[in-house]
A protein has these predicted regions:
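Flexible, glycine-rich active-site loops centered on histidine and acidic residues
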Residues: 152-186
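Acidic, glycine-rich active-site loops and adjacent beta-strand->loop/helix elements
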Residues: 34-36, 104-109, 135-138, 163-168, ...
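Condensing-enzyme catalytic core mediating Claisen C-C bond formation in acyl metabolism
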Residues: 17-72, 175-246, 250, 254, ...
């Protein structure tokens, strides 16, 4: 057993809520099955034993103190399925009522079947059409948009949307520039149409720039292969940190402003800006460029690190569990990441 394996946690982070299109964003208040059992996490002091770094260096540059790691048996499908089951229970519907399952992930357990198909089999959603979306840290927003489109076209009524990642197996644990950033986790939402015609998803914008794809890459994945038992250095997550920083602090304010203009919404009317949890410096500069108080930018990256497509639903769930969201609150969601991809969404809770 390696040093890393000893710190991989059985206590991964699951989250779930119910999201209704064209209606309030209704959230179940029953959290009996919200799974955050006793845990062991990899904190910054632990990372200092395997790479040349320390707690102060990591916190000052990223804001991260610790992150959850899979124990190797609890992979992306496992986490997504558990989040899905909790979301179904909180929404009060059965798995056989799902018309569709969309999983956003860049760290699938297998190439085929897709994570969504594996989740379908695990939870017994026998009627659901299933597919995955790879939009990196923007994935959850892209998946929500896709669910919305299917529902609006009358092709689905009830959709499970999940973001799930096991990034710990995609990281080069000898590279202090990247291994300090990422954690494992999952989140899921039930998306349904609500004919009350108030609240819900109001508007969204998305974008991509494939010409900048080399800025953030993962050219190999942690999938079992009898002909390739060890990963080459270039197969792990690699990124140009400065380029990603410039991209995020430029594109996110731009697409948020597009959303506000499109919906004729004043920035002061936004209760929270729920952004992908990448780096505290990125979030602080985005707030500054939008001329918004940083208190409107909730953060939990200090405890979970960058969980890619799972970060937004995890943060939304925490806000709700802490009774910080009320019916009618307007919230901006925004993701940004590899591809490059980005997006923003205005919802009413």
């Amino acid at each position: 057993m390696t040093t890393i394996d000893k710190w991989r946690s059985k206590a991964l982070y699951y989250t779930m809520f119910e999201f209704r299109i064209k209606g309030k964003c209704y959230v179940s208040q029953n959290y009996r099955n919200r799974q955050l059992p006793s845990k062991k996490v990899a904190d910054n002091n632990f990372l200092s034993t395997i790479v040349d770094t320390d707690d102060e260096w990591i916190r000052q540059r990223t804001g991260i103190k610790e992150r959850h790691l899979s124990n190797g048996k609890e992979g992306t499908t496992y986490m997504a399925a558990h989040a899905a089951e909790a979301a179904l229970e909180n929404a009060g519907i059965g798995a056989d009522e799902l018309d569709m399952i969309i999983v956003a992930t860049v760290s699938a357990d297998t190439y085929v079947p897709s994570t969504s198909c594996s989740v379908q089999g695990a939870i017994g959603a026998i009627r659901a059409t299933c597919f995955d979306i790879n939009a990196a840290c923007s994935g959850f927003l892209f998946a929500l948009n896709t669910a919305y489109a299917y529902i609006e076209m009358g092709m689905a009524k009830t959709v499970l949307v999940a973001g799930a990642e096991t990034l710990s197996r995609e990281v080069d644990w000898s590279d202090r520039g990247s291994c300090i950033l990422f954690g494992d986790g999952s989140g899921a939402a039930i998306v349904q149409k609500d004919d009350s015609n108030v609240g819900g998803l109001i508007a969204s914008v998305t974008g991509s720039d494939g010409t900048q794809g080399d800025v953030l890459t993962c050219k190999g994945r942690g999938i079992q292969n009898p002909f390739h038992n060890s990963k080459r250095k270039k197969d792990y997550i690699r990124m140009d940190g400065q380029a990603v920083f410039r991209f995020a602090v430029t594109m996110v304010p731009r697409c948020v402003k597009q959303i506000l203009k499109k919906t004729e919404t004043d920035v002061d009317d936004i209760k929270f800006f729920v952004l992908h949890q990448a780096n505290v410096r990125i979030l602080e500069l985005i707030a500054k460029r939008l001329k918004v108080d940083i208190d409107k930018f909730p953060m939990n990256l200090d405890r979970y690190g960058n969980t890619s497509s799972a970060s937004i639903p995890i943060l939304l769930d925490e806000l709700n569990r802490n009774h910080l969201l009320e019916r009618g609150d307007k919230i901006i969601l925004s993701g940004f990441g590899g591809g490059l991809t980005w997006g923003a969404m205005l919802i009413e809770w």
